[in-house]
Each structure stands twice: as structure tokens, then as C-alpha cells.
Amino acid sequence: MKEQIQFTTSEKYKDNVVLRLSFEFAIRIVQFSEILEEKRKYVIAKQIIRSGTSIGANIKEAQNAESKADFIHKLKIALKEADETEYWLFLCNSINSYPNCDELIKQLQPILKLLNKIIGTSKNNIKQ
């Protein structure tokens, strides 16, 4: 069985799936960026670590939003960062001298889907 990674001390967040997935993804992004830096791919490593770790940070920030609109705004930022990260990962996969990152791309997909679903549901709740 996979060891549970601690991503919060708060009971409020412990069952937050998108927060947990984005934290686990950020760990993998840091590890991948370290591999890129070892291969002297500094520019891409910096871009990937910035956008890839920002996803979870924005999701966490959204948990303390001042309003529903603020919550949606912060999750949209997380979604933009996820889209940017996906771009960099596909770019890496397209260049032979870069390590393969199919697993990272696969790990990112449920985060993208959850963010889109949460944003859509939250927008619908505002309209009601």
C-alpha cells in the first residue's frame, strides 16, 4: 500500500482530494526539476518548478478565499498554472535530450479535470 504523504495538519483539508493530488504532483515536479538541473536544463527546470508547484499553492490559498468569486479566481489561477505546466512537460517530451515525463503528464490530468469541475460547479452555484 502506498504511504500517505502528509500535506496538511488541518482536519479541514485532510479529505481535500485536489489539494492532496496537487501536493503529490508538486513533489514529483521538484524531483523532475532536479533531474533537469543535473542535465543542465536550467531554464526549463525553473519554468516547470515555478508553474508545477504553484498549482497546489493556489489551491491551498483558495481554501481561505474571501468570497466565492475570490475562490473561483484563485482556482482559475491554479488551472492556468496547470495548463502551463502541461505545456512545458509536452515540450520536454518533444525534445530528445530531455527525460521522458509521460508519468507527470498522466498525473496532472486528474488535477486538471477536478479544477475544471470545481470551477464550473462554483460558477453555477453563484448563478443560483
List each model region and its residues.
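Short, C-terminally biased terminal segments at protein or domain edges
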Residues: 1-58, 65-128
